[in-house]
């Protein structure tokens, strides 16, 4: 099991350059840094090569996360939008591969954040999402990339809200490189049992995000971490565990995540680094790795 952190913990904008954080997370003791793929197509090949070299030099693994926009929605009723989504993913995955990234997770099957001002079609979006992921899975597989479909809470998406729904979706896609992604923040809202949800995902669990119920770093809240760790051990999970804390207001990140108050206790960068280091030690202790 490898432990990582989403670079957005320190940032306010999804478009922020993530390269400078590689050395930081290495010094803090992490194995992985997860980066947002939203703007990766804006990077030049030279920039991508520099980032890849930095990761290798610092012994850091890169993973990626993404919440596609509404105009790139693979489950849209509009065939033109679905086609735009497929083209977007093929370009994005090609650039992700240039960073030697082998895992990308998020609402790949849909878009994020969902617009609930209009009625949603869960069954239709599910079926189109299966078709859409099926349509990019082989392309991703040829690049050595696993697609990890994130199960989100009801307030952020309607298609997949539980581990059981995620498993059914992945089985319907039927591709070996398409996996389930779980996140303790979302599980806290939707699942009756963390342990049961993880065991339901079982061997299909390809990526795992952690955080407290209010998005603080692990160890600063009330999540049943020992239950979570036991379940991960029960299924012999050896993948990435990525903490995804959001504790600062402001910017597109604060707005999209709905962080309306400072959850860091007024922490400066040094204190945020310390909190991340302590959360890593806590995570290794309770979850393993």
From Swiss-Prot:
Please list the cofactors this protein needs.
Mn(2+); Co(2+)
Q: Which residues form a coiled coil?
A: none
Spell out the catalytic residues: 150 (proton donor/acceptor), 244 (proton donor/acceptor)
Q: How does the record characterize pH dependence?
A: Optimum pH is 8.
* Thermal dependence of catalysis: Optimum temperature is 50 degrees Celsius. The activity of D-psicose 3-epimerase is very stable below 45 degrees Celsius but decreases above 50 degrees Celsius with increasing reaction time.
Reactions catalysed, semicolon-separated, are: D-allulose = keto-D-fructose
Give the family, as the similarity comment puts it. Belongs to the hyi family.
- What does this gene product do? Involved in the biosynthesis of D-psicose. Catalyzes the reversible epimerization of D-fructose at the C3 position to yield D-psicose. The enzyme is highly specific for D-psicose and shows very low activity with D-tagatose. The substrate specificity decreases in the following order: D-fructose, D-tagatose, D-ribulose, D-xylulose, and D-sorbose. It shows a higher level of activity for cis ketoses than for trans-ketoses.
What is the official name of this protein in its record?
A: D-psicose 3-epimerase
């Amino acid at each position: 099991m490898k432990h990582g952190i989403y670079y957005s913990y320190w940032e306010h904008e999804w478009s922020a350059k993530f390269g400078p954080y590689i050395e930081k997370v290495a010094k803090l003791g992490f194995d992985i840094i997860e980066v947002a793929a939203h703007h990766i197509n804006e990077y030049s090949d030279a920039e991508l090569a520099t980032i890849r070299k930095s990761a290798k030099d610092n012994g850091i693994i890169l993973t990626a996360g993404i919440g596609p926009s509404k105009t790139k929605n693979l489950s849209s009723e509009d065939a033109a939008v679905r086609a735009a989504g497929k083209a977007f993913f093929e370009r994005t995955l090609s650039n992700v591969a240039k960073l030697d990234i082998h895992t990308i997770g998020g609402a790949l099957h849909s878009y994020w954040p969902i617009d609930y001002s209009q009625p949603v079609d869960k069954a239709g979006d599910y079926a189109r999402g299966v078709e859409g992921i099926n349509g990019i899975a082989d392309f991703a597989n040829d690049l050595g990339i696993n697609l990890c479909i994130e199960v989100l809470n009801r307030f952020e998406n309607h298609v997949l809200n539980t581990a059981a729904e995620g498993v059914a979706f992945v089985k319907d896609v039927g591709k070996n490189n398409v996996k389930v992604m779980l996140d303790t923040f979302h599980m806290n809202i939707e699942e009756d049992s963390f342990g049961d949800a993880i065991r339901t995902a079982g061997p299909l669990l390809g990526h795992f995000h952690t955080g407290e119920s209010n998005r603080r770093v692990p160890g600063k809240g009330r999540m049943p971490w020992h239950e979570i760790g036991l379940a991960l051990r029960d299924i012999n999970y050896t993948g990435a565990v990525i903490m995804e804390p959001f504790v600062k207001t402001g910017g597109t990140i604060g707005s999209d995540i709905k962080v309306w108050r400072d959850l860091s206790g007024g922490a400066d960068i040094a204190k945020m680094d310390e909190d991340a280091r302590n959360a890593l030690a806590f995570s290794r202790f309770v979850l393993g790795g």
